[in-house]
Amino acid sequence: MDTKTPVTLAKVIKVLGRTGSRGGVTQVRVEFLEDTTRTIVRNVKGPVREGDILVLMESEREARRLR
C-alpha cells in the first residue's frame, strides 16, 4: 500500500445483512475512530463481524440500504 494514500479507520458497530447476487457482500454500519459521532453504512466483501476495524480508502461514499 502506498504510504501517501490517506486512509480512515472505522469500527463495525452493527452487521445489517448480506447483499450481492450470491450473498458475498455484507452491509455494515461503521463508526469512525477519529470522529465517534459519525456513522455510515458500507458494503464489505469477505468475512466481517461486530468489533472489526476496517481500513477505508474512501470515507465519504455511503452504501444504499438493503430492501
Swiss-Prot record:
Alphabetically ordered keywords of this record: Ribonucleoprotein, Ribosomal protein
InterPro entries named among the record's database cross-references: NA-bd_OB-fold, Ribosomal_eS28, Ribosomal_eS28_CS
UniProt xrefs under SUPFAM superfamilies: Nucleic acid-binding proteins (SSF50249)
RNA-binding among keywords: no
GO CC, alphabetical: cytosolic small ribosomal subunit
GO biological process terms on file: maturation of SSU-rRNA; ribosomal small subunit assembly; translation
GO function term, MF aspect, one: structural constituent of ribosome
Family under the similarity heading: Belongs to the eukaryotic ribosomal protein eS28 family.
Protein known as: Small ribosomal subunit protein eS28
The organism of origin for this protein: Kluyveromyces lactis (strain ATCC 8585 / CBS 2359 / DSM 70799 / NBRC 1267 / NRRL Y-1140 / WM37)
